[in-house]
Amino acid sequence: MSSHNGIHPAVRVGHVHLSVSDMDRALAFYRDGLGFNLTGDGRQMGLPMAFVAAGDYHHHVGLNTFKPSGLYHVAFNYPDRRQLARAVRRLQDHGYAVDHATDHGGTVAVYLDDPDGNGIELSYDRPRETWFDAAGNPILKADRIPVDAI
């Protein structure tokens, strides 16, 4: 199998983020029906989002009520900040605009749309010990950072 376009072989699909019409109904399906663990509930902070995962990963499925139901974005997880920075530079070198970058606490991500308007997130995870605060709660934040800081 060839490495088409030079993408790092350790890149994985990190998560899928879905826009849902009813958060309680969605959580009943993903948590109760499928058995995912609720790993973060932004509603506790007034944010219309929740995260579920299998095992101890921060999230495999993100749920929000930001826009009409459907795919919000797909995330590709890079092995480290250096590989993420290379991916951003490659996109920019090919004329694609990166919309913004965000520090989520345990994850740093950049966001853009593909040519058809589908949301794309490229991210890397910080070490697991940085994902939680002193009380063991997941750190949920969305601090904008300069794209060139990646």
Mark where each language-model region is.
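Basic/polar N-terminal segments that are highly enriched at the extreme N-terminus
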Residues: 1-7, 150
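Short functional hotspots where side chains directly engage DNA or cofactors
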Residues: 2, 131-136
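Core segments of cupin and vicinal oxygen chelate
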Residues: 7-10, 17-63
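Vicinal oxygen chelate
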Residues: 10-11, 20-24, 56, 68-69, ...
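Conserved catalytic-core motifs of GNAT/GCN5-like acyltransferases
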Residues: 37-44, 123-133
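Conserved acetyl-CoA binding element of GNAT-fold acetyltransferases
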Residues: 50, 72-73
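Low-complexity, intrinsically disordered terminal/linker segments enriched in charged
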Residues: 136-144
